[in-house]
């Protein structure tokens, strides 16, 4: 697969892609970049300060830091202290849309740390922030205090927005002709669904667990890594796939013991597959690849509408084919469709 991409980039752009592509575990991608499809062409990485703030006088951070799965993370948007109130309000709305109560920040202007929260920080806490974030004049530090995954996602989105603001100001360059391919691997096999009160498959229920983690299915399903992989380029997922379960006993365990699907439902929906596996299905897997996304990137556009054969408008109209068009009564009869016009 990497060989195919290498050939395409060479033939189309005369660019030599280095292979093999780097591999980044899901946890690292979220922890450093706040997203499972990181754009690694620029830094602005997230830094974890959970341990730092466990005994802090700032109760919001301290309470999160000592809570189960809580995390306090920070991001230094270097040179963005000149952010406008409108831009700051927009970032805060984005953070709130992802579950944050607000967006804490510190501006560094004229050598002074400007923020209502600074008064709660000890000298040791300030020193660690300074050292690990490389804080300098004109910087702005954004914080997220939340359950780990949510906190990462909040700052991950702020990271992308801040990068665009820095690009607009000429303070950051993101090369359009830099192709940072990587594989994101080791996704969690299961995630806990709070509403349903049980586990759900992160990818799909046929993904095979990592062999060394399979024993944890009984005791700690959320700690099991799945053999799921995504190929990512410059912050865009080009494709994803997995190695599938091929052992009937393991597949049945995932259905019934982990996902809690009733045995009769498993039999009615998947019985044919479990029986087929008993005849010796080999280990197998694959990948679903977004050809249109790849072509869009090669053409220098971010919208697949520019490269697909029959793009649709926002109203789902195909302007080239002038569709959709009215259907005839005969077509409706052939398909046994009856339309009912509401009474006015």
What are these regions (language model features)?
Residues 1-344:
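Class II aminoacyl-tRNA synthetase catalytic cores and aaRS-like
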């Amino acid at each position: 697969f990497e060989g195919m991409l290498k050939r395409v980039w060479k033939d189309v752009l005369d660019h030599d892609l280095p292979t093999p592509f780097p591999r980044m575990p899901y946890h690292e991608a979220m922890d450093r970049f706040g997203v499972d499809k990181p754009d690694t062409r620029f830094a602005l990485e997230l830094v974890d300060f959970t341990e730092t703030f466990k005994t802090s006088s700032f109760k919001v951070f301290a309470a999160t830091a000592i809570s189960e799965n809580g995390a306090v993370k920070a991001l230094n948007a270097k040179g963005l202290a000149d952010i406008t109130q409108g831009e700051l309000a927009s970032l805060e709305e984005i953070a709130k849309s992802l579950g944050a109560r607000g967006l804490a920040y510190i501006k560094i202007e004229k050598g002074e740390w400007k923020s209502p929260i600074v008064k709660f920080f000890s000298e040791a806490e300030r020193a660690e922030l300074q050292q690990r974030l490389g804080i300098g004049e004109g910087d702005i530090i954004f914080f997220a205090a939340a359950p780990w995954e949510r906190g990462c996602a909040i700052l991950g989105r702020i990271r992308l927005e801040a990068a665009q603001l820095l690009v607009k100001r000429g303070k950051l360059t993101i090369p359009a002709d830099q192709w940072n391919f990587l594989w994101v691997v080791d996704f969690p096999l299961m995630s806990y669904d709070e509403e349903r009160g049980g586990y759900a498959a992160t990818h799909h229920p046929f993904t095979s667990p990592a062999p060394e983690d399979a024993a944890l299915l009984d005791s700690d399903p959320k700690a099991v890594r799945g053999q799921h992989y995504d190929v990512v380029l410059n912050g865009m997922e080009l494709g994803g796939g997995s190695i599938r379960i091929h052992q009937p006993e393991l597949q049945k365990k995932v259905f019934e013991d982990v996902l809690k699907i009733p045995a009769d439902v498993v039999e009615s929906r998947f019985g044919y597959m479990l029986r087929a596996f008993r005849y010796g299905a080999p280990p197998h897997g694959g990948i679903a690849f977004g050809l249109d996304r790849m072509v869009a990137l090669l053409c220098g556009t971010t919208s697949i509408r520019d490269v697909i054969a029959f793009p649709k408008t926002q109203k789902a109209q195909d302007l080239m084919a002038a569709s959709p068009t009215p259907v005839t009564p005969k077509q409706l009869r052939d398909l046994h469709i009856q339309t009912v016009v509401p009474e006015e």
